[in-house]
Swiss-Prot record:
Organism for this UniProt entry: Oryctolagus cuniculus
Pfam families, alphabetized: Hemopexin, Somatomedin_B
Tissue specificity field: Plasma.
Domain of life: Eukaryota
Domain SMB per the UniProt entry, residue ranges: 20-63
Protein name: Vitronectin
Hemopexin repeats: 158-202, 203-250, 251-305, 419-469
Residue numbers of Sulfotyrosine PTMs: Y75, Y78, Y80, Y279, Y282
Any one GO molecular-function label of the UniProt entry: extracellular matrix binding
Functional description taken from the UniProt entry: Vitronectin is a cell adhesion and spreading factor found in serum and tissues. Vitronectin interact with glycosaminoglycans and proteoglycans. Is recognized by certain members of the integrin family and serves as a cell-to-substrate adhesion molecule. Inhibitor of the membrane-damaging effect of the terminal cytolytic complement pathway.
Gene3D superfamilies reported in the protein's UniProt record: 4.10.410.20, Hemopexin-like domain
Length: 475
């Protein structure tokens, strides 16, 4: 019997190891659980925290409702009447934020919780209640009681913009002079422009803005030698701060900025700053953990990016969102050398949504009643309470996520479309970057760093494609 002893011992050790490993069995809908050694929630692929049997037990899939198939400024066939009936203006609702520790910019800049009360800014996109599109405010009025007269700020004037940025709830904001605009899928939302002072608590104009693409989704505004940081519309304690302290190596009075996500939780987020004919690349030291973000609403922009990690695009994400071993700022480079086709000086910049190329559906026999821009905004599937019990989108919510060319496909079961339709061999994620200069803008493919070749060509009119103004010579 002696020879059996080693076999028995080995079997016992194997049992101990297997017992120590947690499983996703019956856990696929429980969400993030800080008390577990491994996770089974929908974001575990990004955080590299999934249990070993996550794929087998939970069968993670990228569905049609998780992706865009067109960039923001393109057009597609669209049944306007049906969309208007089903559509609603959905904005993420804020919770009382519990601010997690911000990624380290430098050792002496840690935010001390409770050091001083936060300055509440009535950031309208985070604070508004749900209402159908047809029930928007009357044009020229605002929820804050401030109305900008056309003499003060003419929407279609062609004046250059100072900044564009997506907020964590997917709302798109544009800044020009003393005013800011919130943009919907085709134009400016009713009630805008509003004074930057009334919405953000900062006197305009500002120089640049960006929103980090991580679970916290904090927004940064830059003006002169200082910057402000907001979470859920509330100014973080001890702000504003000097750019030289928080972003060492980045100059004051920047012209533009945009942020990119890390390729995964082990990677680093990047921000590009532009001033004059040069640009700087800055890399954050670290990003917040999933546990640190549990007390606040999840960034819808980050959620959309993290969902794409379910599929086989790891190598592409590493190529697009690579990171250097060390953080901080790199030496400045010339814009004209690295961003081909972009003017030598830009006024504003913004990272576009990630869309999947090669997924254009077959035309429907259904009559196409209209063509409309496809600037669908991000929609959080978790909603206000971040409930993860429902793993699939309803038909109505799925419609809000689809690009405009998908909405006219006719009747089908929206919940039956899984990864069989999405083949990485024939499609891949595309990250666009928008550069705004004067009254025109350019769309650049991040991977090639070249202006896209499309028809109509770039540069295109900001007023026409982003503000809903008539085309030059139009009515």
């Amino acid at each position: 019997m002696a020879p059996l002893r080693p076999i028995f011992t080995l079997a016992l050790l194997l049992w101990v190891v297997l017992a120590d490993q947690e499983s996703c069995k019956d856990r696929c809908t429980e969400g993030f659980n800080a008390n577990r050694k491994c996770q089974c929630d929908e974001l575990c692929s990004y955080y590299q925290s999934c249990c070993a049997d996550y794929a087998a037990e939970c069968k993670p899939q990228v569905t049609r409702g998780d992706v865009f198939t067109m960039p923001e400024d393109e057009y597609g066939p669209y049944d306007y009447i049906e969309q208007t009936k089903d559509n609603a203006s959905v904005h993420a609702q804020p919770e009382s934020p519990t601010v997690g520790q911000e990624p380290t910019l430098s050792p002496d800049l840690q935010t001390e919780g409770g050091a001083e009360p936060t300055h509440e800014v009535p950031l309208e996109p985070e604070m508004e209640t749900l209402r159908p599109e047809g029930e928007d405010l009357q044009a020229g009025t605002t929820e804050l009681g401030t109305s900008a007269s056309p003499a003060e700020e003419e929407l279609c004037s062609g004046k250059p913009f100072d900044a564009f940025t997506d907020l964590k709830n997917g709302s798109l904001f544009a800044f020009r002079g003393q005013y800011c605009y919130e943009l919907d899928e085709t134009a400016v939302r009713p009630g805008y422009p509003k004074l930057i002072q009334d919405v953000w608590g900062i006197e305009g104009p500002i120089d640049a803005a960006f929103t980090r693409i991580n679970c916290q989704g904090k927004t940064y505004l830059f003006k002169g030698s200082q910057y402000w940081r907001f979470e859920d519309g509330i100014l973080d304690p001890d702000y504003p701060r000097n750019i030289s302290e928080g972003f060492s190596g980045i100059p004051d009075n920047v012209d533009a900025a945009f942020a990119l996500p890390a390729h995964s939780y082990s990677g680093r987020e990047r921000v590009y700053f532009f001033k004059g004919d040069k640009y700087w690349e800055y890399q954050f030291q670290q990003q917040p953990s999933q546990e640190e973000c549990e007390g606040s609403s999840l960034s819808a922009v980050f959620e959309h990016f993290a969902m794409l990690h379910r599929d086989s695009w790891e190598d592409i994400f590493k190529l697009l969102f690579w990171g250097r071993p060390s953080g901080g700022a790199r030496q400045p480079q010339f814009i004209s050398r690295d961003w081909h086709g972009v003017p030598g000086k830009v006024d504003a910049a913004m990272a576009g949504r990630i869309y999947i190329s090669g997924l254009t559906p077959s035309p429907s026999a259904k009559k196409q009643k209209s063509r409309r821009r496809s600037r669908k905004r991000y929609r959080s599937r978790y909603g206000r309470g971040r409930s993860q019990n429902s793993r699939r989108l309803s038909r109505s919510i799925s419609r809000l996520w689809f690009s405009s060319e998908e909405v006219s496909l006719g009747p089908y079961n929206y919940e039956d479309y899984e990864t069989s339709w999405l083949k990485p061999a024939t499609s891949e994620p595309i990250q666009s970057v928008y550069f705004f200069s004067g009254d025109k803008y350019y769309r650049v493919n991040l991977r090639t760093q070249r202006v896209d070749t499309v028809n109509p060509p770039y540069p295109r009119s900001i007023a026409q494609y982003w503000l809903g103004c008539p085309a030059p010579g139009g009515q």
